[in-house]
């Protein structure tokens, strides 16, 4: 992004919701947005029409105009109808948490595989938005161009999306077949596969670089690794293949997670998974992210051996560290936890 686009960040807080404001703000700043203001509202439940209160939408519009913001991003997940209604009210671009994450994915994508996966994820995630747009535009009898999610009759839109999704999936299948051939070759050579996994920025790529003397990018914010890398690891008595993979994120939308299936396959085919947990974060974050990581690993690799690596322990002192480690051991009962 050559020029920093000004954005207002919004969050609707309802009972049981985990605040995401700081996470989304960090991602947006990593992409290149200038977050000029953050607004939040506590409610008993989401407004089905615009997520947040209608009066709050008017405030968002006023703040955006006063501060020159052309983008309004929600830390929440929005429906297609909510996005379109808010967009119409504020006359600006509206993003939700998942679209912000996808924008970061697009910025970080370096390989053909990751670019295809991101394109597929965006199509699948915004498909319902497009249908809603076509429906709403039809009701309003407005002319819509193909630049928006709609643009033509619903059946044509649906057919076009299905065709594009089919093409992307076919290309990803070809990449997956190629990876499967490489895995079969590794198995034939007798190399066990060790997969690194964990929440984004947990330190797994730093570990990968130091162990295999690689120079993958690190320290650029969330989701530096969007594709997998595999390197031969020389060990006393037995060599192995060390694989780095995409970082996990809490509550990633299932459609986005499914689009990265070829990447997660590297974990499912491993002989051993090393799960990195950043224990330097606050206790609640460590607990939530541990559960999120465990859920994903057990979904894609339910029977694979797992070792949990408590990372960044030098940043936590004394009894606090022991308390964090105790919580991790309880979460991953039955698995080895290091140290």
List the predicted regions and their residue ranges.
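N-terminal accessory targeting/assembly segments
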Residues: 1-103
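Conserved G1/Walker A P-loop phosphate-binding module
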Residues: 4, 133-261, 267, 272
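Short hydrophobic segments within beta-strands
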Residues: 10-12, 197, 276, 309
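Flexible beta-alpha connector loops of hexameric P-loop NTPases
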Residues: 13-15, 47-49, 108, 215, ...
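Short, conserved glycine- and acidic-residue-centered signature motifs
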Residues: 17, 53, 116, 219, ...
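Conserved C-terminal guanine-recognition region of P-loop GTPase G domains, centered on the G4
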Residues: 20-29, 57-66, 73, 77-92, ...
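Short catalytic-loop micro-motif centered on adjacent basic/acidic residues
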Residues: 71-74, 218, 337
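Canonical P-loop GTPase G-domain recognition
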Residues: 89-149, 314-339
